[in-house]
C-alpha cells in the first residue's frame, strides 16, 4: 500500500495548480470519489496527510489512480463536480438518506379548504402549522377540529351528501351551494386553535367536562380531558422566531463516527414548520459536506428554495454554490451566516434535533437487529453481517461480491470484490462459485486472525446455503458464525436448523435488513461484472474493423483473449460470423495481448 501511495504522490505533485475536478479510482477503474478544487495539486495532496480521518485513510487504501479535469474557474469546477457526482454516484461521496421529519398540519388552498396531517410542504398556497412532535396528540386534536367545526373531508364534489354529513360532522359543502361564508367562519375558528388561541375552546371543553362528570359519564369525561391536554401540549411546542416573515432554512451538520446527520429547520412566515433529518456516510469533511449537501438538497426537483439559507459554519465561501442553486432553480436565495442571540438559540435546537434524529436512526436499526436475532435464533445481536452474491453473463466473467453491514448500516470500507478462478469458460455453477468466495474470504480471516462476522448471508436457496456451509465446516468455523440464505422469489429465509424455510411478512424489520444486505451485494456484484465485460469489450474495439456489437459478440461467443488463443482463424470466423481476414486480426490481437501480459508478469 505504501508503495502504491508513494507512486501516486509522485504523480500528484506534478498536477496543475489550476481549478478543476479530480476523480479517485480503484484498480478496476471504478470511481470511488469525486471532488473539486481551486488548486488541484494542493487539494489532492491533502489526502496523503498522516493526520487524515480513518475514513479518508480507508479510501486512499483503495485508490489506485487519480484523474483530473481542469476548468477555467472555480465555479465551472463546482458545476462539473455536481454533474459528475449525479452521473457516477461514487460510493464515498455524499449520498443522503432522508429521516422522517415531524408532521405538520396543512390547510389546503381550495374553495372549501381541508385540514389534515402531512410531512411534505407543497408550494400551492396551502397554509402550514407545526411541526408537532407528539403525533398521537396531534391526531386527537385534528379529529376534534374536524368534528367540531365540520371541516370538509371529501376531495371531490358529489350529488349526494356524504357519510360525515349524516353523522353531523360536515356542513355538506360536498353537494350544497353557497356555504362559503358559513364554512369560512368555522375554518377561522380551527385556524385560531392551530395558531395557539385555545383559551376559549378550553373553557368550552371544561364546561362539557364538568357536565360529563356530574352525569357520571366518565368515558366522555376522559376523552374531553385528553383533548384538552392535547390542545395545550401541541400549542406549547411550536417554536416561533422573529424572521420578519421571511422563509428561512437553518442547516446544521452534525459529524458522527459512522454517520453524519444534517438537520434542516424550515421556518415559513416566521414559524418553524418542519424538521428534516438527513443521514450521510461519505468521507467528506464538514466544510465540504455542507457544500455538497446544499447542492444536492436544494437542486432536487421537488425542493422549494427559501428566501435565505442560514448555515452554522463560519468562513465558508458559498458564493458559487448560491449561484449554482439560483441558476438551476431560477431563484434568488442567499446563503448566509450570522451570529445573534436568537440564532444561537436556533443552533442549540438544531444540535439537539440532530442528536435526537441520530438516536432515532440508530434505535430503529437496533430494534430491527433484535428482531433478526429472534427470527434466526441467534445468541448474540447480528451487529456485523457479511453478505455474498455471484454475478455472470452466460458463464462469462463470473465474479462475487461481499458487503458488510455494521449495526444494520452499510460499512463500505469492508466491501470486497472477487474475480473467480474455479469455473471454466461458460460454466454456470453458483455452488462452486460460492464455495470459492467463502473459502477465500474466511481463509483470509483465519490466516490474519481477523474478527468473524456474527452472520453470513448468502443470496440463494438451500443449495447455496449448503455450499457455503461445506466450506465453513472444512475451515472448522461452522459453529462460530451463523449462516443463512435468502431466496429471491418467495423471500424465504433458509437456516441450517430449519429445512422448510421461514417466510416473514413483507415489511418485517428482520426481513428488511436481510433484503438490504442481499440487494447491496447484488448491486455490487452486477456492477463489477458489467465493468469487467465493458473493459473486455472496449479492448476488442481496438482491433481494426471491430465495432461495439462485434466486440460484444466475441465476448459472448468466445470470451477473453485467453479463450481466443487455442482457436484457429476458421473457428473464430465460424463462431462470430466474420470473414477469415478479420478473424486473423482477432487471433493476432489475442497473441499480442497474451505476450504483453506475460512480459508484465516477468518484470
From Swiss-Prot:
Keyword annotations from UniProtKB, A to Z: Cytoplasm, DNA damage, DNA excision, DNA repair, Excision nuclease, SOS response
Gene3D superfamilies the record matches: 5' to 3' exonuclease, C-terminal subdomain, GIY-YIG endonuclease, UvrC, RNAse H endonuclease domain
Compartment(s) of residence: Cytoplasm
Gene Ontology molecular function terms on file: DNA binding; excinuclease ABC activity
InterPro entries: GIY-YIG_endonuc, GIY-YIG_endonuc_sf, GIY-YIG_UvrC_Cho, RuvA_2-like, UvrABC_protein_C, UvrC, UvrC_RNase_H_dom, UvrC_RNase_H_dom_sf
Residue stretches making up the GIY-YIG domain: 17-94
Swiss-Prot/TrEMBL GO biological process terms: nucleotide-excision repair; SOS response
Pfam families membership: GIY-YIG, HHH_5, UvrC_RNaseH, UvrC_RNaseH_dom
Predominant location: cytoplasm
GO cellular component: cytoplasm; excinuclease repair complex
Subunit structure: Interacts with UvrB in an incision complex.
Function: The UvrABC repair system catalyzes the recognition and processing of DNA lesions. UvrC both incises the 5' and 3' sides of the lesion. The N-terminal half is responsible for the 3' incision and the C-terminal half is responsible for the 5' incision.
Family per record: Belongs to the UvrC family.
Name assigned to this protein: UvrABC system protein C
Source organism per UniProt: Borreliella burgdorferi (strain ATCC 35210 / DSM 4680 / CIP 102532 / B31) (Borrelia burgdorferi)
Gene label: uvrC
